[in-house]
C-alpha cells in the first residue's frame, strides 16, 4: 500500500495542483464577468456595441454577458433582485427607485446617450414642419411615466401646446407594436424610435418630420446603473467597465456612420446596411451619443425639470445622491 502511495504520489500532487489552478481560473473568470441587462436592444446604444465588437471590454479583462430586459420595469427588477450587476436604462428609473426609499441604493455611474432618441413620423412629408401642427391631431405616443413620453410632452409645452388637451395622445399600444399600429392606420403622427422610424420611411409608409431629441436638449437619457453595494464591492470592475465604454464612445465620435454601422452590423443582423448608416448618421448629427460617460449636473437638473413638468417626479433627488462620477472622472482623465 505504501509503495502504491509512493508510486502515485507525484501524480496526485500534480492533479491537486491542476485542480487548484482550475479553481483559481474559474474564480477569476467569474469575478471578471459582468451581467449587463439593457432596457431594449437598440441602435441608440451604438457605442456600447462598438465597445463589444472592437474588443474594448476584453482589453479590460471583462466578459460581458448581455441580456435584453424588454422594458424599464423588468430591467430594474433584474438589478434589484440581484440577477444583474449593471443595467442600461433611463436615469428616471433610478429616481423612481430612490424616491420609494427602498433599502437598496441605486446609483448612475456612466452615461451612454444624452438626448431623447425618438422621432416624429408623419403620414405625409412636411418640409416646413412646426410643432404647432400637432394641434388637434392624434399622436401615437409612448407609455406614461417613461422618458420618451415626458420628453414629448415637454417639447409640446415649449411650443405652446397643452399635452392631452391640444394633442390627443394615444397610449394604449405596446411599445413593440407602435410601428405596426401606425402603418395600420392608428394616429396622424407617431413618436417612434429607430430603426422603426427609418424602416417605415424607407417603405414609403411614413416620413420623419422632426426630432424630439434635437428639440428637448441634453439630459442623461440612458445611463448605466448599479447597486451602491455592488459598486463598493467591485470598484475595479466598475472602473474597467467605464474605461471600455469610454473607448467605445470616443471611437463612435471619431468615425463616420458607415464605419460605425459596419462595426455593429453583427448585433443587428435583420437591419439592412442602408438603414443602419442612416440611423447612426441621424444620431451623430444631433449628438445623441454621449462622447464621455460623465453625467453632468446641469443635464441631470434638466431631466428633473422635464419630469416635474410632466407630473412624474415623485421626489427631487439631489445630483450627488444619485450620481457617482468617480469612475467617469478617472477614465476621462486617463487614469
Residue ranges and their predicted role:
Residues 2-13:
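Bacterial N-terminal signal peptides that target proteins for export
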Residues 21-23:
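C-terminal motif of bacterial Sec signal peptides marking the signal peptidase cleavage site
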Residues 232-314:
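Secondary-structure end/capping motifs
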Residues 32-164, 168-172, 181, 188-194, ...:
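Short, glycine-/small- and polar/acidic-enriched structural segments
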Residues 25-32:
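Bacterial lipoprotein signal-peptidase II cleavage site
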Residues 303-335:
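Conserved C-terminal helix/tail region of periplasmic/extracytoplasmic solute-binding proteins
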Residues 93, 124, 165, 174-268:
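Pocket-lining segment of extracytoplasmic ligand-binding domains
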Residues 69-73, 88, 142, 146-147, ...:
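Soluble non-cytosolic domains of exported or imported proteins
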Amino acid at each position: 500500500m505504501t509503495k502504491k502511495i509512493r508510486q502515485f504520489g507525484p501524480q496526485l500532487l500534480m492533479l491537486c495542483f491542476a485542480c487548484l489552478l482550475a479553481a483559481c481560473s474559474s474564480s477569476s473568470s467569474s469575478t471578471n464577468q459582468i451581467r449587463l441587462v439593457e432596457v431594449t436592444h437598440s441602435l441608440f446604444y451604438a457605442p456600447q456595441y462598438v465597445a463589444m465588437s472592437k474588443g474594448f471590454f476584453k482589453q479590460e479583462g471583462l466578459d460581458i454577458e448581455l441580456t435584453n430586459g424588454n422594458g424599464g420595469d423588468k430591467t430594474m427588477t433584474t438589478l434589484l433582485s440581484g440577477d444583474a450587476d449593471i443595467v442600461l436604462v433611463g436615469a428616471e428609473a433610478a429616481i423612481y427607485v430612490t424616491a420609494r426609499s427602498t433599502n437598496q441604493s441605486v446609483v448612475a455611474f456612466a452615461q451612454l446617450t444624452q438626448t431623447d432618441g425618438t422621432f416624429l413620423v408623419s403620414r405625409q412629408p412636411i418640409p416646413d414642419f412646426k410643432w404647432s401642427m400637432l394641434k388637434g391631431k392624434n399622436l401615437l405616443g409612448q407609455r406614461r411615466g417613461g422618458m420618451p413620453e415626458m420628453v414629448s410632452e415637454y417639447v409640446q409645452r415649449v411650443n405652446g401646446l397643452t399635452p392631452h388637451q391640444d394633442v390627443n395622445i394615444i397610449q394604449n399600444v405596446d411599445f413593440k407594436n407602435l410601428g405596426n399600429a401606425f402603418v395600420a392606420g392608428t394616429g396622424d403622427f407617431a413618436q417612434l424610435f429607430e430603426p422603426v422610424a427609418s424602416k417605415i420611411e424607407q417603405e414609403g409608409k411614413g416620413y420623419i418630420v422632426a426630432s424630439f431629441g434635437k428639440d428637448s436638449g441634453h439630459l442623461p437619457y440612458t445611463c448605466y446603473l448599479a447597486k451602491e453595494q455592488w459598486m463598493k464591492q467591485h470598484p475595479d470592475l466598475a472602473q474597467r467597465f467605464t474605461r471600455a465604454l469610454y473607448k467605445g464612445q470616443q471611437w463612435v465620435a471619431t468615425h463616420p456612420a458607415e464605419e460605425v454601422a459596419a462595426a455593429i452590423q453583427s448585433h443587428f443582423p435583420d437591419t439592412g446596411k442602408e438603414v443602419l448608416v442612416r440611423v447612426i448618421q441621424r444620431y451623430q448629427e444631433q449628438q445623441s451619443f454621449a462622447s464621455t460617460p460623465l453625467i453632468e449636473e446641469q443635464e441631470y437638473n434638466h431631466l428633473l425639470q422635464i419630469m416635474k413638468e410632466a407630473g412624474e417626479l415623485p421626489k427631487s433627488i439631489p445630483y450627488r445622491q444619485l450620481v457617482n462620477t468617480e469612475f467617469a472622472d478617472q477614465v476621462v482623465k486617463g487614469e
